[in-house]
Amino acid sequence: DDRNSAKFVPLSVVTNDAPRHVKHPRINWQDLVIYEAHVKGLTWANPEIPEEERGTYKALGHQSTIDYLKKIGVNAIELLPIHEHATEPAIWARGRRNHWGYNAIAFSTPHRGYASTSDPISELQEAVDRLHENGIEVILDVVYNHTAEGGPGGPHITFKGIDNRNWYRHGGTSHYIDNTGCGNTFSAGKPHGVRLVIDSLRWWSQVIGVDGFRFDLAPALNRTGNMIDSALFAAIAADPVLRQMKLIAEPWDISRYSLGEFQYPWREWNDYYRDAVRQFWLGDIARGYGEGVSALASSISGSSNIFYFRGPTSSVNFITAHDGFTMNDLVNYHQKNNLANGEDNRDGNNTNRSWNVGVEGPTDDPKILQIRQSLQKSLMATLLLSSGVPMITMGDEVGRTQFGSNNAFTLPIDLNKENWNGVSAWNGGWTLDWEPNEANQDLQNAFMELIRIRQTTLSRSQYLATTCRFLSSSLSRISRFQ
């Protein structure tokens, strides 16, 4: 491709963004409740925000957004990538866009598509400050493991045009090493790669003012040995600013699984926990026997079999995340439905550990509906009452559905509902429902009560087995969910 991309993606833009004083909430890990959300999806349907501001950084800092987060009881929001990103050419050709944003073209630039003004930096800073003023921390999902340039046939819009050989990992003259499943692997372990990532992290920390980072496909950032030997992670540990940030690893990539290998003060997404909880509630109970009790017990007590002396707050517990079924879909669907992405349903995981309670998708059967509602509450209770750091996915508290999609990373280029051709043409449920029906309001009430219980009696930094004590029975202190 010999077209000039300079007017779309200049190789450099020099700015003078000075570090600023930021009042971080500094919430202890054992008190943290993380809410994973998308800037646009969280605010797009909020009726209290002017239409022209919905889906933007300004909407993120709107008082109604903040009031909602405070009402449900979460105190940290983990934002899907907000750095400048691009849609893959093949996806764009199908009339769709990359909604999630895991396709970076500029590590230290806020995505312009989420700005309501011509000054996205100031707009984002104001949103972060407003969240901080209300006791809510901001964690960014950052993608330094690959870029939007893809493999050998991909576009030349950033690092390929500067120094392709040194900015990407190569296995031969032109062969890209792909540890990410996205066509390339960024050389984050080389000195120039380390410097760039550190500078980017410091920019987000000191200029924007965020409180922490979740590192996408973290093992891909280090291919030289174990996590202790990583040049990048060593540089983060030595940096006086970054070592104070909250650091969360997604401890796997497509060729390496590293759960439990990261060292303090890192925390890790715990998919062992996810699978154990799903297997117990949606696998064993569905079959009428409980082989997964042992795995469930170790998981809810802090996963000491994985994190050992590091303690339970090393585990970020989750049952759902942006990729995979929503909690509602876990009890509605057995089969994935990713046809909207245009890949003939080949994409997405085929192993979901879900249970549709005998009917695939929506039903009017009151008995099935009651079981599904109870299962969602059981999943919520397990997550929020476990030792570790809980993370809930946006909308699970109000029964958000993606209609069986477990890879809802694309949306139509045109978000006008009048132009959507049925459920099969889009990954539904990409926005938060700000006006839930009676059943979903019931879920939200249960969610809020569970967080209240957690924050008043179950916050702990040690494994359950070392802190367990018996309390006198008092029915007035018992919360019961059906």
Annotate each predicted stretch with a short phrase:
Residues 40-210, 217-241:
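Substrate-binding/active-site clefts of carbohydrate-active enzymes
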Residues 1-114, 313-352:
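N-terminal structural segment of carbohydrate-active enzymes
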Residues 13, 222, 229-394, 407-409, ...:
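Conserved alpha/beta catalytic core and glycan-binding cleft of carbohydrate-active enzymes
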